[in-house]
Amino acid sequence: MKRLLSLCTLACLLLCLTGCHTAEQSGIPFYYCRDSAHYQYFQQDGVICGEKRDLASHRNDLDYALGLYLAGPMTEGLSSPFPKNTQVISIRYHDETLHLELSDLSRSLPDPEFTLACTCLTMTCMELLPCAQVTIVSADRSITLNADSLLLFDAPQEESTQ
């Protein structure tokens, strides 16, 4: 009797854990910037924050996903790093390299902000596709990022006294 009760309990726990795992995987993280009012330097969270978005039947539609990304976040405290009305002009994906051309509205961004915006977009694209690197072109600017080039933790550096 104890064995039967133990097996039933174990089966119920396994079924519950399986359900939790599926729900967690349903959303794709879209990466945006924290508003400056919500960002504290030298904390565990960086300036970039993920927001889970449900793509439902559009999971494999990169054009749709990027349009949804550029529309901006839904979570309070996050903001889109790109100017409003930024659009995707072209998308090319070949040999794990994604090449995106954006409208030239990002020309209004200073270089550090453009790099931050491209980092957010690269991280989002790497969640959507198996990319080794992402190249983003906007007007006369171009940047290529891969997972190894992303430093995402803002931490104080200790000086060596030797």
How does the language model describe each region?
Residues 3-8, 14, 19-162:
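Bimodal "functional hotspot" detector
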